[in-house]
């Protein structure tokens, strides 16, 4: 009582406290970073190693395995996967959430150093690592095009100058340059000319390497001067290499230009990049795992004028893709939704109270509570994101509830003729405990969320804390500022025997009278209500089992990502044509704004595309509808498939896959994996619950298998090393020397001229110089036959792995897809030697499914404990919690009605309903208990009077919460996929709960009261006179 009086009778102090909360909130709001979602990126590090010309199996056994054994000892590694292809190996390390990325990087470098002695010789460089997730979509893509510059020269400028500058920007984790490769001097050998001159390929290689050296020459000095010695020991251009003498034939010099074409070209000619219809160099920028995407993009954009200033006039630099506009638009939509929710809630209050002065009080209390929350968010290191702003939107209904309960009770005393300050003090005292109970029990709902681990826990933590802080501030405001404003702003009125009967007042009176009549009937037919209550409990269980489930709603971020998978024996020239064909199909779609793509590198039969859609206001279709439309057109392209998926703000795992979800097959036997993977793939491809089924196990590439006759080789004086060196020199794009320039280092690349290696007959032209100096054709000691070979070898941990990726057809949920996969694996009878498990987002979904019921039960148990402590009763909390089944039924039915699967966002809605709907029961139970204690009423009389007396505040608080959530349901535009499931769940639960709990709660109250009396009679002891 004295606590409330302190603030009611000291208005200046109360106003200044509220002003201080508001000012701190405004300052926090200005300092808060902006993001699409809370920070939930796993720390990921990618290790890369190369050995040009090495087969995928060689890379896996000699490079990947030693590195994996060393890297696998690092603490905190969640998952280690590797992919080895022609000449390259890439290992992805995903760490625990609590692992510091910089500390993990130091451990990775130490592990690489430890494995260095086990790696093969001939590697052009040591393995390197990058602190970025290669499976993440780039946050920004820049393109370089030019009418006069070659692709190699553009690539050199991009990688040497632009990429280095961009990588220094805060938040940038990796700048991947694609579309070509570094400039190089390429030596294309003529096998017939070499044979005629009697020159071996090794001799050419050694001559070039010896002619291009960079060694210190020292200095000469006398007593006065010092001269630095400089020689022309380096050859830097193709023109300088052409006259190089590589051999003498009968005293005549054989020059390099006589037996080879020497050109200024690029290191790897099997690379191509495009933007729309033009050749381009792509700079794909990814952020650090812990970086903020908006701040990073803003930093890049701020650097663009400087970058453009350093670019020659012949180069055009453009932004091909930027993830930030849709994020900003989504947050703007949430902010508008928040403003609409506040306005609707204030309107509800005005309609019920029909007083401008009375409405002004919650109109002040709500902004103070919401704005003050920003200060706490800043102190906690949170951001302004979709979830935290949705928490504030939902909090609008909660924070006004506290003010409504206090305000309505004070208004009731004023209508009875009590003086304002006395009414404020008396009214606050009566409902103070009720408001505290409602707020504490609501905050208790979120305690299990704060203890939840993994990605879901990280994702929901900001939502839970933000909402809890807003409720806490609202509690303080409703018990301090609200009664003070009521005491000083509202006026008492003469007691009336009847309330006004105009407009909404007449409707409320009619509703209250109708409710009273129906409640009397219900209290006389409690068994029927009991059956209805038990029916809702059973219906809850059935609906939860039956409803389709997913991890997170599919977002429309305005960006699509596509992976091209062509025939495994396709050539680079044909693959480049496929890229152009696919880009034309997509570019012609009316919803597409920009298309970029590239192909080549170590995987000739694959490519990547990034598609920017037009803003939501300029297109009618969602991203998924556009994918469905394009899928039909793309399927007509022969020899290759393009798999499209909408880029999501959450992508789990480090695997690069051509679809959103993955199912991984593991085995310690590569033979068993290769036997069962095609069978499983065929069975899964036939499932209607899956779309775009594809795989990364590519073991049908074309291979030419050479079989040496070792006896013949020994007789001819040829060893295996010389034969292998011949093949590497001829067909491996072998980097044989380095050209040092001020800005970068470039390579001399040697191979047989492509004109002489267009078919298998090229092998017949190859020869080896034996120990006697004679040229021995390869066909003398080797036979060759075509065979199948893997284009890549994949590992997870140290086991052979194959990942099957899939998307979901429209109308299919992730739960339906995972159930179909598990059922199919059981039907196939896959042996124990081949293990299957979901990975990435599908794996997190499985883990979340297992913990959802536990989380809901934990929330209910926590609320029960808090209510039990507050009421000092085991029974009354059960009465209050009896409101939950009806809310659950309403929420699940609403999701079914809107064809929305049960996701993590819907789970948040269920948790919120646990806190919202029990408020009705708290208000009823509080007044019923008070009526029994002070009024001497029977339980039936007390609960009946409490229901009628609290009908108006119950309607006000329910409608306030409902109207606070309604804008989430009706919202469109960017980010609506996240907001709508939350609004649907809350609105559906509130409507059903309001219809049923007004009747079930009084019946449950009386049931437990009778049960308590029976229990007390059985345990009562007879009085014994002594």
From Swiss-Prot:
GO terms for cellular component: plasma membrane. It is found in: Cell inner membrane. The lineage of its organism: Bacteria, Pseudomonadati, Pseudomonadota, Gammaproteobacteria, Enterobacterales. This is Multidrug resistance protein MdtC. HAMAP family: MdtC (MF_01424). Gene3D superfamilies: Multidrug efflux transporter AcrB pore domain, Multidrug efflux transporter AcrB pore domain like, Multidrug efflux transporter AcrB TolC docking domain, DN and DC subdomains, Multidrug efflux transporter AcrB transmembrane domain. Belongs to the resistance-nodulation-cell division (RND) (TC 2.A.6) family. MdtC subfamily. Its main location: membrane. Keywords: Cell inner membrane, Cell membrane, Membrane, Transmembrane, Transmembrane helix, Transport. One of its GO terms (molecular function) is xenobiotic transmembrane transporter activity. It is a multi-pass membrane protein. It holds the Pfam family ACR_tran. The chain crosses the membrane at residues 15-35, 333-353, 360-380, 387-407, 431-451, 463-483, 528-548, 853-873, 897-917, 953-973, 984-1004. SUPFAM superfamilies: Multidrug efflux transporter AcrB pore domain, PN1, PN2, PC1 and PC2 subdomains, Multidrug efflux transporter AcrB TolC docking domain, DN and DC subdomains, Multidrug efflux transporter AcrB transmembrane domain. Disulfide bonds: none annotated. Part of a tripartite efflux system composed of MdtA, MdtB and MdtC. MdtC forms a heteromultimer with MdtB. NCBIfam families: PRK10614.1 (NF007905), RND_permease_2 (NF033617).
């Amino acid at each position: 009582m004295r606590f409330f009086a302190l603030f009611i009778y000291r208005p200046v102090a109360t106003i200044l406290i509220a002003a201080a909360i508001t000012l701190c909130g405004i300052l926090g709001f200005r300092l808060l970073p902006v993001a699409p979602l809370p920070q939930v990126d796993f720390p990921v590090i990618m290790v890369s190693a190369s050995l040009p010309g090495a087969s995928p199996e060689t890379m896996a056994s000699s490079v990947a395995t030693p590195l994996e054994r060393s890297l696998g000892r690092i603490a905190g590694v969640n998952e280690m996967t590797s992919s080895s292809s022609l000449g390259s190996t890439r290992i992805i390390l995903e760490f625990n959430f609590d692992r510091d990325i910089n500390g993990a990087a130091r451990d990775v470098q130490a592990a690489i150093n430890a494995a260095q002695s086990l790696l093969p010789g001939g590697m052009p460089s040591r393995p390197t690592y990058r602190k970025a997730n290669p499976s993440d979509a780039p946050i920004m893509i820049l393109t370089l095009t030019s009418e006069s510059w070659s692709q190699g020269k553009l690539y050199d400028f991009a990688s040497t100058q632009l990429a280095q500058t961009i990588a220094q920007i805060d938040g940038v984790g990796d700048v991947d340059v694609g579309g070509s490769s570094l400039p190089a001097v390429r030596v294309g050998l003529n096998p017939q000319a070499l044979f005629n001159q009697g020159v071996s390929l090794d001799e050419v290689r050694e001559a070039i390497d010896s002619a291009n050296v960079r060694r210190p020459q020292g200095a000469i000095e006398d007593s006065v001067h010092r001269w630095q010695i400089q020689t022309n020991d380096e050859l830097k251009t193709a023109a300088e290499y052409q006259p190089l003498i590589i051999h003498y034939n009968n005293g005549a010099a054989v020059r390099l230009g006589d037996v080879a074409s020497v050109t200024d070209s690029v290191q790897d000619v099997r690379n191509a990049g495009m933007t729309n219809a033009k050749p381009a160099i792509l700079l794909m920028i990814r952020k650090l795992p812990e970086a903020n995407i908006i701040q990073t993009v803003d930093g890049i954009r701020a650097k663009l004028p400087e970058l453009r200033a350093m670019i020659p006039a012949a180069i055009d630099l453009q932004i091909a893709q930027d993830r930030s506009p849709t994020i900003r638009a989504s947050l703007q939509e949430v902010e508008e939704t928040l403003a609409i929710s506040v306005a609707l809630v204030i309107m509800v209050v005005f309609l019920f109270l029909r007083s401008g002065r009375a409405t002004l009080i919650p109109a002040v209390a709500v902004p103070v509570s919401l704005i003050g929350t920003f200060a706490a968010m800043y102190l906690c290191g949170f951001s302004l994101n979709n979830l935290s702003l949705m928490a504030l939107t939902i909090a609008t209904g909660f924070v006004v509830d506290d003010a409504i309960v206090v305000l309505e009770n004070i208004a009731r005393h004023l209508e009875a003729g009590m003086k304002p300050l006395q009414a404020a003090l008396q009214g606050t005292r009566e409902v103070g405990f009720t408001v505290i109970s409602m707020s504490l029990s609501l905050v208790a709902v979120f305690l299990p969320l704060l203890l939840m681990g993994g990605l879901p826990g990280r994702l929901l933590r900001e939502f839970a804390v933000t909402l809890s802080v807003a409720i806490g501030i609202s509690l303080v405001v409703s018990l301090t500022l609200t009664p003070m404003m009521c005491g000083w702003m509202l006026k008492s009125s003469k007691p009336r025997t009847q309330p006004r009967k105009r407009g909404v007042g007449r409707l409320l009176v009619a509703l209250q009278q109708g409710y009273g009549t129906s409640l009397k009937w219900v209290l006389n037919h409690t068994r029927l209500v009991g059956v209805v209550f038990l029916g809702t409990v059973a219906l809850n269980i059935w609906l939860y089992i039956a409803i389709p489930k997913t991890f997170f709603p599919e977002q429309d971020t305005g960006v699509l990502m596509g992976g091209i998978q062509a025939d495994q024996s396709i050539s680079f020239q044909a693959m480049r044509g496929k890229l152009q064909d696919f880009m034309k199909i997509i570019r012609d779609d009316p919803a597409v704004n920009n298309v970029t793509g590239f192909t080549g590198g170590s995987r000739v039969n694959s490519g990547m595309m990034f598609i920017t859609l037009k803003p939501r206001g300029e297109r009618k279709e969602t991203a998924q509808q556009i994918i469905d439309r394009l899928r039909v057109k793309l399927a007509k392209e022969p020899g290759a498939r393009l798999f499209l998926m909408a880029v999501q703000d959450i992508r789990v795992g480090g695997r690069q896959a051509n679809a959103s979800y993955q199912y991984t097959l593991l085995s310690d036997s590569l033979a068993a994996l290769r036997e069962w993977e095609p069978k499983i793939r065929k069975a899964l491809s036939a499932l209607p619950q899956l779309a775009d089924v594809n795989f990364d196990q590519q073991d049908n590439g074309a291979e030419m298998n050479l079989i040496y006759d070792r006896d013949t080789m020994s007789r001819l004086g040829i060893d295996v090393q010389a034969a292998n060196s011949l093949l590497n020199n001829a067909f491996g794009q072998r980097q044989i020397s380095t050209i040092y320039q001020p800005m970068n280092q470039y390579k001399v690349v040697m191979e047989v001229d492509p004109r002489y290696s267009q078919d298998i007959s090229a092998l017949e032209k190859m020869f080896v110089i034996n120990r006697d100096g004679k040229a021995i054709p390869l066909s003398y000691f080797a036979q060759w036959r075509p065979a199948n070979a893997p284009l890549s070898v994949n590992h997870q941990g140290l086991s052979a792995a194959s990942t099957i990726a899939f998307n979901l057809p429209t109308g299919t949920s992730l739960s339906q897809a995972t159930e179909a996969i598990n059922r199919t694996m059981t039907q196939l009878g896959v042996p124990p030697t081949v293990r299957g498990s979901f990975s990435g987002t599908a794996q997190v979904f499985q883990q979340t499914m297992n913990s959802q019921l536990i989380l809901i039960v934990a929330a209910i148990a926590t609320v029960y404990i808090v209510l039990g402590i507050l009421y000092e009763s085991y029974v009354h909390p059960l009465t209050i919690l009896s409101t939950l089944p009806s809310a659950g039924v309403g929420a699940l039915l609403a999701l079914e009605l809107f064809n929305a699967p049960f996701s993590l966002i819907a789970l948040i809605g269920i948790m919120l309903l646990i806190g919202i709907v029990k408020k009705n029961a708290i208000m009823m139970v509080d007044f019923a208990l008070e009526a029994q204690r002070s009024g001497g009423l029977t339980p039936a009389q007390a609960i009946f009077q409490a229901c009628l007396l609290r009908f108006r505040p119950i309607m006000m608080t329910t409608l306030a919460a409902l109207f606070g959530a309604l804008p989430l349901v009706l919202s469109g535009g960017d980010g609506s996929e996240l907001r709508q499931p939350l609004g649907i769940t809350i609105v559906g639960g509130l409507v059903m709960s309001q219809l049923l709990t007004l009747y079930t709660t009084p019946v449950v109250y009386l049931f437990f009261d009778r049960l308590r009396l029976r229990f007390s009679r059985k345990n009562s002891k007879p009085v014994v006179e002594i």
